[in-house]
Each structure stands twice: as C-alpha cells, then as structure tokens.
Amino acid sequence: MKRIVTGILAHVDAGKTTLSEALLYTTGNVRKLGRVDHGDAFLDTNTMERQRGITIFTEPAIIATPNLTLTLLDTPGHVDFSAEMERTLAVLDYAILVISGADGIQGHTETLWRLLKRYNVPTFIFINKMDAPAADKTKLLNQLKKRFSDGCIDFTGAHDDNAVLADVMEDIAMQSETAMELYLESGTIQDETIREMIADRVLFPCFFGSALKMDGIDEFVAGFERYVREPEYDSEFGARIYKVSHDAQGNRLTWLKVTGGEFKAKTMLSGTARVGTDLGESKIDDDGMWHEKADQVRVYSGAKFTTVDSVVAGTVCAVTGLTRTFPGAGLGKEPDGVNPVLQPVLTYTLLPGECDIHACLVALRELEDEDPLLHVVWQPHLEEVHLQLMGAVQLEVIQQMMHDRFGLDVSFGPGGILYKETIAHPVEGVGHFEPLRHYAETHVLLEPLPAGVGMRFASVCSEDVLDRNWQRLILQHCREREHLGVLTGSPITDMKITLLVGRAHLKHTEGGDFRQATYRAIRQGLMEAKERGDCRLLEPWYGFRLEVPQDMVGHAMADIQRMSGSFDTPSGDGEYMVLEGEAPVAQMRDYAMDVNAYTHGRGHLSCVFAGYRPCHNADEVIEQSAYDPESDLENTPDSVFCAHGAGYPVKWYKVPEFMHLDYAWHGMGEQ
C-alpha cells in the first residue's frame, strides 16, 4: 500500500476545503459531507475558521483507500496565512493545486506555483467550479500552459484502467525525450514513465470538476491513486517539523513528518537551538544543541487523534513533551530547513488598553512559539511590544486569539514598514563589563554577508585564552536576541558575528557578565561602523507581476518608475501586457487598489517578498525615526570599568583606550 503525504493549496475561495471534504466523503472516510459555509467542514476545526469561512491553520486528514493511505494537509488559502502554508511544503510528497474555473489563475496562485517549484513538489491540478457560467475548459488549459508549464495536460479519463490517454499521449511524450522515444517505439507510454515524469515535475496532470456538486471527484481520486508513487525511505531516523501548536489542555504539540527509520514514543531527541531564543544555560550543550524526551505520539485526522507507540517513515504525527522545537527544524539526519520565501514586511505596535502589557507579552510569546515569523519584540525604552504580520486579516485573527485563548482584549496600531540594518565593511566591537565583583570583556568581529543570508555566528578564540564554556556562553548570547542597528533601531541582518577573544576573572566572573559584555561589544562595533559611514539601512522589496490592458501599460510603467521600481521588457498577447520586476514594499503595498481603479477591475497584480535591498530613501527614513542609539539604554554601546572599588561608565568611543585586551583583528589596528 502506498503511503503518501499530500498538501492541498489554493487561492482563497477557490474551493480548496470543499475539495478536501469531497475527497473524504467519496473515499468513505467521513459519513457526512461538510460545507465551509455551513461551518461544519471536517478540517475547519477551529472556531475562528468556522466563523470566517477560511482556513487559518494547516490540518491533517487521513484518507484510506484499498491501495493508498493518504495524509491530506489542508493549508490556508488567504495570503495573510501564507507562511503557515509554506512551512507545510517541506513535508509534502505531492501537492494538489486547486484553481477556480470561474476566476482562473490569480495572483496568489502564481505565488503558490513558484513556491511549489522552489520546494520541488510534484503537483496535480484540480480546476474547480467548472459548473460556473464563466468556466471555459479550453481557455483555462491554455492559460495553464502559458502561465505555468506546457506540461499541464488534461488527464480526463486517466482513471480508467484501460484508458491510455490516447488524445493527449503525444502531448505527454513531448514533455520528455525518454517519453518521446518510448512513444515512438510503442505508440504508448507506460504508467511508470508517467509517474516518473510527474515526480520530476515535467508533467502536471489536470482534472476538471465541481467539488461542491461532487462532479469529477471519483475521476480525480482514481487518477491520483494511479499516478503517485511512494517515496523511498532509508532506515536512519529523520524527521522534519512543519508546525507547533497547543491543544485545548495547553499541551505543546510538535507536528512532524518522519522521513526515515522509525519514531517511538519516549525517544530522546536533540536539535539545534533557534536563533533568537534564550535557551537557558542548563538547556544547551557545548555544541549549541538541545536534548529532550518525546512523550506522546499522536496521529491526527481532523480534530481527533489516536495515541500510538511508534510510527514509520512517511507518517505525519504530533508529539508532546518537546519545548525547544520550531517550524522548519530537522531532527535526526534531517538538517534545518531554508529561510522561508514568504515573510512579513509590516510591523505593528500592540495597544494593550486596560490589559497588563507584560501579560500580553507572555501571551504573544506563546503565539510566537507557534509562528516564529511574528518576531515579537519588547521595546523597554518605549515600553511597547512590536510584532510582524502579513496583513490586516492576520492582525484580526491574532487579536481574536488573544481574547479567546488568553482573555486579553487588545488592539494594534497602524502597520509600518519593517526595516533592517547591516554593515558595508568589517569592524571589531569591544564590550567590557566590570562593576564591583563582576568581570567580562568580549571582542567580536562584525562582517557583512551577502543579501538574504541572515545572521551567522562563529568563534576563532583559542581555548588557551578563554575557556570553552565561556566561549559557548558568548555565542549563546549572540544568538539569543535580535540585536538592533544604530541607524533606526531596526534588527540587524546579513552579518557574521565572530568571537575573536575574551577575558574572564577566575573569582569575579558570573554568567550574566558575558551577556552584558557581548551585547555591548556588538553595539560598540555598530557605532564604530556608523562613525565610518559603514552602516546601511535596508528595506523590503516585492517581486511583482502586473497584467494590464495594452492601452494602460504606459500608465503602469510610469507608476513603477515613480515607485523607484524596475521591470523587464513588457510582454503580452495583444490584448493584455505583462510587466515583471521589483519595487520597494513601502511604495507598492497599496498599489493593488490603484491597479483595480485605473483598469476598472481588468488588471491583476501579484506580489511576493523578494528580499531586502538598500533603502531608496534612507536619509528620510532615518530622520523620521529620530532614533538615538546612545539614549537606548537597553541596547547601550557603552562599557563599565572598575577603579578604586567602584564601577564607572565609559562611552563607546573611549572604550579602546580602556579595554584590557588588544584589538584581535588587524583591520582595527590599522585605523
């Protein structure tokens, strides 16, 4: 029996959850056909999902047929919850991409297609709502071939064991040299060759129907069952985590797919600490790894679960007892995943109202544990909590979750652009912390990294100079928080922080001393870089695809240039023109409404996060932020030295005159 993990993805309102219900009902896995608009869909297990009629959280369902055990992961379709969807892609064997026959390919559908390509997920396509008056099968197929791939081929009839897809066999053969050779030799293509082409993402079977009316569902199930193949797994244990949640009793659930070997309850697990998490000194070993024992292993289908003793490779399960896991992490042989493509570019300020702000912070930390992209930050000097969100609908959901789960009635201020900071050249930072009966000095090298790499950490300090335990502690302090830049107080990124040298006192040094010295060293280095003009402000950019009527392309081009964006040579078919390029989020965030207005609803704009670039109006943003790094006492660049039995502060620019260790990087000595 084949064991397959499949995700179902779609633009919002394409009928994704309705198709999931139809698949469950057709295969006899549910007795009653639920409906999203009736609030009784099998996979919409959350109250908010039933109220809003949209999928917010990825939920599993087990579909069993005589030849297939299918774990179906129903993912969110709304763009604000795309991060939840993207995290799921790393555990999929196949994807089912649902497209509305009435609307065709939408902007978010194109984003999904690009993500499926990036994660190399073989894809079946179900064109839904074919009962709608506007649905045109020929037109939709042409659109799929033009916008996605020539490998998008109608598989109507593929469920029949005797069918050979005769009408499209030549089209299938044209997608692969091997398939063409076989077709020319025998006049047909065997099922195994078709399975291989689908797995290699050169062939994308397309099915048409109406999930609500149960039309085309049997055909799709049979075709899917016929043309998928089970992945091969080895005996070495591995697992990939795609989600963290909490059940109604408050138990923390780590959702994962086993990718090798067997996973048993009560197994001792280990993994790499997540950057930005303070693990506590007793929770991490010298290599920066956590070690915890799994408790229960649960296999879910909808809201119900079965507790099992073990699961085999290819199984999706939820595990209790783990507190240090995070979405995207690998266990066993699996490495941690890559940085997600879809990331929030807006930051919001919590307005606690009459609620205790620290209680709000604790609640938001739990939500951040489930969704690390929230990036909850406490700003002590402002006594504010900031978090990052994808958009207004996610903000409303967070607000409702704060009320429903924690009893906190809060609101949020208007969203602002999430800026980041980096440096242009290497610099050595020095931090010294020596109040009476305390002692620590840290030297770190800050180096720029290529755009999009994020933060990296290392040590080149000799253990003859500083004990390994202290070095481990310093690196932990580098990782455990999101360090802020000195231009606008925005998070730093694309930077490598290397421990060069440090000093401890045999009698007076305590664990917290190196935390202070390390934080101050990083900030002092950033201030040195700012003094030299080496700090850079970064802003998020969108990659966009803009389709407008031909007579309006001039308007669109002028808009993009005005927004400091760029685009490739326009392309089109005569009636419509397409512009593809990049532009700052700050300029393009509300442009979809403008497009809808000047094209009278005929234009389409799709945007996807394209990374951070140098800010196009950095001086203006820095001035508006009015950030003073020397007044930010929670992130001070200054040091504390001791003389005559008392500690005294030393400004960052005077630290080199007082530091106890010489510069360790030759570049500083040459200044």
Describe each region flagged by the PLM.
Residues 570-571, 578-671:
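C-terminal accessory nucleic-acid interaction domains of nucleic acid-metabolism proteins
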Residues 1-91, 95-99, 105, 146-148, ...:
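P-loop NTPase switch module centered on the Walker A-proximal segment
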Residues 1-14, 32-33, 101-248, 269, ...:
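P-loop NTPase catalytic nucleotide-binding module
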Residues 227-229, 234-347, 384:
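Conserved nucleotide-binding/hydrolysis modules and their immediate coupling elements
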Residues 197-200, 285, 334-346, 377-378, ...:
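Flexible hinge/switch segments at interdomain interfaces of large molecular machines
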Residues 415-480, 503-505, 536, 543-574, ...:
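C-terminal polymerase-core module
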Residues 300-425, 468-531, 550-553, 586-588, ...:
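C-terminal effector modules of nucleic-acid-centric enzymes and ribosome-associated factors
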Residues 14, 26, 30, 78-79, ...:
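Conserved nucleotide-binding/hydrolysis micro-motifs of P-loop NTPases
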